[in-house]
Design a protein with these regions (language model features):
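Glycine-rich, acidic and aromatic/proline-enriched surface loops and short helix-turn segments
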Residues: 10-23
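Basic/polar, cationic surfaces and motifs that engage anionic cell-wall
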Residues: 20-155
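A short local loop/turn or secondary-structure capping micro-motif enriched for an aromatic residue
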Residues: 1-2, 22
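Extracellular/periplasmic catalytic domains that process cell-envelope and extracellular macromolecules
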Residues: 3-9, 90-94
Length: 155
């Protein structure tokens, strides 16, 4: 699968099965929330389910630990100062860390990365992270402001 260009070799790709765009929503599917924002393809985004987002956050937490057997640092590539990218980042040089697909190609991945950051770094509970991510992403342009969230202290 050659989906992430030069990132494929030195990376682990995580793809959520999600209609992403409202026009692909199946009848009676589990997806319920649609956000608007210029960062989304066509300006509208079907939010993954809470279960999908929780599983993604748990996987990222594990992948960035020594237990995984990998050397992936918990570095949020799209985070600069207190702003997290929701779309392309300037000069996306290949480097270790956690990337959203949209940082270098396509238009997906930013919302799950935002949710995971809120869970793993801000320490929010699942439902609070979900509602906060939706509120931050709704109408956002290129970035969301995370300055009001203190990063949890390492133990």
């Amino acid at each position: 699968l050659w989906h992430a260009g030069a990132h494929n070799g030195p990376s682990v790709g995580v793809e959520l099965v999600n209609p992403y765009e409202p026009r692909f929503l199946p009848r009676n599917g589990p997806w319920e929330r649609i956000l608007t924002g210029p960062w989304a393809a066509g300006g509208r985004y079907v939010v993954p389910t809470l279960a999908q987002l929780e599983t993604t956050a748990a996987l990222l937490a594990w992948l960035t630990t020594p237990d995984s057997g990998l050397s992936i640092p918990r570095v949020w590539v799209g985070l600069e100062s207190s702003r997290l990218a929701m779309n392309r980042i300037e000069r996306p040089t290949l480097r270790p860390g956690l990337w959203a697909h949209t940082y270098f190609a396509h238009a997906d991945g930013a919302f799950p990365v935002l949710f995971a950051w809120l869970r793993l770094e801000a320490g929010l509970g699942a439902h609070e992270a979900f509602s906060t991510a939706c509120a931050l992403a709704e109408g956002a342009r290129r970035t969301v402001d995370l300055s009001s969230f203190a990063r949890k202290e390492s133990s």
